[in-house]
Amino acid sequence: MSDYGEWAVIVPFRSLDVAKSRLAVSCRRDLALAFLQDTLAALTLSNHISSVIVVSRNAALSETIGTPVIKDQGSGIDDAVEIGHRWLREHGHDGHYSVVMPDLPALRTGDIDNFLSAASRFPRAFVADSAGTGTTCLTTQQAAILSAFGRNSAQRHTRMGYKQIPLGLPSLRLDVDTIDDLERAARMGVGRHTQRLLISNNELHSLRFPCAPG
């Protein structure tokens, strides 16, 4: 349906103050930032992605992460998606859009490439999380982005006409919300920012996460 080489990606990142509240460690703020940085690192290596922006209440993050940050003035993920979409259109992007969650520290560029290749055959597509109930990534080739992120979003996105891509894509499905999720990601192999924290942070190091090469 499309040449999938011109995807613009929106990464909604609420704020460091409220991110990863279910991670039962005191360094959750540092982990949230590391997850975001590793997610962005994988995205920016893709030849199929023309631009990546982050939408966040922490607009000053841009200097830290090296990615444009658009000020989030909404009340949730879907508002952030709309803010990012509007900004991209105002700045000349009229191609295809993807939304990727910011908590994919094990993300491999190959998985996002495979997803975009498969998604290019459908007007709208998405990937469910490892539990099969949430959404880690969606795409649209239409003028507007309609999204319904949150609990049980996979079911809602299906009802909205998004095609679920049934590929394995393990690193794209593994969003990290809990310590158990983080252990699974560590076994898969996380990016360098998360791996550095797992090794250097005393609290995390004491949990003895397995650190496979990212």
Curated annotation (Swiss-Prot):
First-level EC class: transferase
Pathway: Cofactor biosynthesis; coenzyme F420 biosynthesis
UniProt keyword ATP-binding, yes or no: no
The reaction(s) this protein catalyses: phosphoenolpyruvate + GTP + H(+) = enolpyruvoyl-2-diphospho-5'-guanosine + diphosphate
Record's keyword annotation contains Transcription: no
Single GO MF descriptor: GTP binding
Binding, phosphoenolpyruvate: T135, G150, S153
Function: Guanylyltransferase that catalyzes the activation of phosphoenolpyruvate (PEP) as enolpyruvoyl-2-diphospho-5'-guanosine, via the condensation of PEP with GTP. It is involved in the biosynthesis of coenzyme F420, a hydride carrier cofactor.
Family per similarity comment: Belongs to the CofC family.
Record protein name field: Phosphoenolpyruvate guanylyltransferase 2
Organism encoding this protein: Rhodococcus jostii (strain RHA1)
Gene this chain is encoded by: fbiD
